[in-house]
Amino acid sequence: MITLTPGRLTLPQLRRIARENVQIALDPASFAAIDRGAQAVADIAAKGEPAYGINTGFGRLASTHIPHDQLELLQKNLVLSHAVGVGEPMARPVVRLLMALKLSSLGRGHSGIRRVVMDALVALFNADVLPLIPVKGSVGASGDLAPLAHMSAVLLGIGDVFIRGERASAAEGLRVAGLAPLTLEAKEGLALLNGTQASTALALDNLFAIEDLYRTALVSGALSVDAAAGSVKPFDARIHELRGHRGQIDAAAAYRSLLDGSAINVSHRDCDKVQDPYSLRCQPQVMGACLDQIRHAAGVLLIEANAVSDNPLIFPDTGEVLSGGNFHAEPVAFAADNLAIAAAEIGALAERRIALLIDATLSGLPPFLVKDGGVNSGFMIAHVTAAALASENKTLAHPASVDSLPTSANQEDHVSMATFAARKLADIAENVANILAIELLAAAQGVDLRAPHATSPALQHAMKTIRADVAHYDLDHYFAPDIAVVARRVRERAFATLSPLSFESEQ
């Protein structure tokens, strides 16, 4: 059980919500603030004075006053008219994160929503009744309206859900969770719809995947150093301290730890090779820059996870209703775009190391890492696959946040495109997982070919993990299953856990 304290969510909590089947509860300490906010809205609605989002239309229709006897219909119509998403359903971890983030935002007490609505979201979550939310349809301002409308429609008994992974009607989902359809009161529909929770959930889910891939890439990169008989001197701490970037310093320390005790390294310590290619030698510089970006993005997303991104905002102490723009997801878009660049670079650097390993001139290994070259093609086309994926990622890494299209009759004339920025991270991460799988296979092959000299104790664990599923490549065979099984192990964090470096979300 994870207790959600609104405004104080942590990255470890969010990773567990995404990756484990934990249940959640709202911190009782938040109840008073929630109740004050709801009462403030009820008081404003009772007075009848125009207040945006409470008794007016929305967006371009904000100047339209809504009579008191139509306020419940207004909220219902808002939810139904905004549920216009298209595409495949959001993944289960993303929906779980989205619901938890929405609860945290509402729980700060500035959205004016009743506790009964929030209790219903908690009940759905804990019963594993998750709204079916189409993944496309948000531009990241005014909030993630369409995705959150699909979540909210379920509270009304409308739409579809997944009950323990099986698709069903929202009405059936409510029954399983022990709930009846809700009637939303003044502002509650808007409070549910307005916010950055969809884009932030997508970005967080992919952040955790990219963190795992980063750790895996440290392992595969270190293994490639030994496979190519590379030097460990470029990882000397003194070099990196002189530059001063925290990520570079930490990455270099990870490579030193992973390669410590390598007999392969000792075997060529006195060779006449002066410098390794950049894909080996500059790993701390490149991976360090990636690490800094990943850490920065994690910090931005944690702030957003704890933010109140509703509009308008209720300030119960003064009774004020303030319209602003906290729904604009530009911080999320920038964080996701930075993650895309970092993840694409992780894959691009790994692809270069694969190219190095199969090149006999550079690596000193048999051409394409296989004996009897000519009859056998070895890793020749596996590298082509890695190159194709790395190239695809370069296009996917183009920033989404530099685009904007005006919406809502030009009332919402600049948007963030944060949801797309966050959504395409999944494609980038999947490509990187496959590139790293190919590198792990190629590096393991190279290390085998360095026998009788062995790699380091730390990297021998990686070798055992690979060889438990895939044998040494002696002769050409149907290669795709080898890549698939190692890629699956990459996704399962089998290699990430071998890295000495970890992230805040894993603490």
Swiss-Prot record:
<dbReference type="InterPro" id="IPR008948">
    <property type="entry name" value="L-Aspartase-like"/>
</dbReference>
<dbReference type="InterPro" id="IPR005921">
    <property type="entry name" value="HutH"/>
</dbReference>
<comment type="similarity">
    <text>Belongs to the PAL/histidase family.</text>
</comment>
<dbReference type="GO" id="GO:0019557">
    <property type="term" value="P:L-histidine catabolic process to glutamate and formate"/>
</dbReference>
<comment type="pathway">
    <text>Amino-acid degradation; L-histidine degradation into L-glutamate; N-formimidoyl-L-glutamate from L-histidine: step 1/3.</text>
</comment>
<dbReference type="GO" id="GO:0019556">
    <property type="term" value="P:L-histidine catabolic process to glutamate and formamide"/>
</dbReference>
<dbReference type="Pfam" id="PF00221">
    <property type="entry name" value="Lyase_aromatic"/>
</dbReference>
<keyword id="KW-0963">Cytoplasm</keyword>
<protein>
    <recommendedName>
        <fullName>Histidine ammonia-lyase</fullName>
        <ecNumber>4.3.1.3</ecNumber>
    </recommendedName>
</protein>
<dbReference type="InterPro" id="IPR024083">
    <property type="entry name" value="Fumarase/histidase_N"/>
</dbReference>
<feature type="modified residue" description="2,3-didehydroalanine (Ser)">
    <location>
        <position position="142"/>
    </location>
</feature>
<keyword id="KW-0456">Lyase</keyword>
<dbReference type="GO" id="GO:0005737">
    <property type="term" value="C:cytoplasm"/>
</dbReference>
<dbReference type="InterPro" id="IPR022313">
    <property type="entry name" value="Phe/His_NH3-lyase_AS"/>
</dbReference>
<keyword id="KW-0369">Histidine metabolism</keyword>
<feature type="cross-link" description="5-imidazolinone (Ala-Gly)">
    <location>
        <begin position="141"/>
        <end position="143"/>
    </location>
</feature>
<dbReference type="InterPro" id="IPR001106">
    <property type="entry name" value="Aromatic_Lyase"/>
</dbReference>
<dbReference type="GO" id="GO:0004397">
    <property type="term" value="F:histidine ammonia-lyase activity"/>
</dbReference>
